[in-house]
Regions:
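Bacterial N-terminal signal peptides that target proteins for export
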Residues: 1-9
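C-terminal motif of bacterial Sec signal peptides marking the signal peptidase cleavage site
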Residues: 19-22
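Bacterial signal peptide processing site
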Residues: 24-26
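N-terminal lobe/hinge region of extracytoplasmic solute-binding protein
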Residues: 38-88
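Solvent-exposed coil/turn segments that connect beta secondary-structure elements
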Residues: 40-43, 51, 72-73, 89-91, ...
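Second-shell loop/turn segments in exported
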Residues: 49-52, 101-110, 156-159
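Aromatic- and charge-enriched surface segment that lines or borders ligand/interaction sites
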Residues: 82-133
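Surface-exposed binding/hinge segments that line
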Residues: 118, 127-187
Length: 187
């Protein structure tokens, strides 16, 4: 009988000590923590405009901002665009690009400021390279399908333009209430 009581007492003390250790606070500093992630495969490219492969996009979506982004509730909020307006007919979207955003080299050196012209250049690049995710906007933006299909070689006919360094404008073929959700990507 005494042996079983001793075992119970020992088990109780051991359980209590585990509980105390589990509930105790640690003294680690949040600044000392590093997030690490192991990818199943190497990315095929870091060209975020032309590739939609999972191994690429899981990296590039953390490096490149779209005009808008989703907040934790799924609402569209400003990202590279600090504000935007939509014409009354729903065909023209005008975005004010956030000033002070920078491009950086692979070595982390500041390269240039992000401007509206970069978004125009990015869309032309995606169209010229027949980017995998171009289908998301190809039939939405005025003239883009004709440019991609070779019916015109003049990119000026495509409904995207930099009004000035920090104003970007898209003209659509028809109103799309969900257009802004297409601007969360990099082009």
């Amino acid at each position: 009988m005494k042996k079983s009581q001793a075992l119970l007492l020992g088990a109780g003390i051991l359980s209590a000590s585990f509980l105390m250790v589990a509930c105790s606070s640690t003294q680690s500093n949040a600044a000392d923590k590093t997030y690490s992630y192991v990818f199943a495969s190497n990315p095929d490219t870091l060209d975020y405009i032309t590739s939609t492969r999972g191994s690429t996009s899981s990296i590039t979506t953390n490096l490149i901002d779209g005009l808008l982004e989703n907040d934790k509730y799924g609402n569209l909020v400003p990202s590279m665009a600090e504000s935007w307006t939509v014409s009354k007919d729903g065909l023209t979207y005008t975005y004010k690009i956030r000033q002070g955003a920078k491009w950086y080299t692979s070595e982390g050196e500041e390269y240039a400021e992000v401007t509206a012209h970069d978004f125009v250049t990015g869309l032309k690049y995606a169209a010229d390279k027949k980017a995998e995710n171009l289908y998301l906007v190809q039939d939405s933006i005025k003239g883009l399908a004709d440019y991609v299909e070779g019916k015109t070689s003049d990119f000026e006919t495509v409904g995207v333009k930099a009004v000035d360094d920090y104003t970007l404008q898209y003209t659509l073929n028809k109103p799309e209430s969900y257009w802004n959700s297409k601007t969360t990507g990099g082009f």
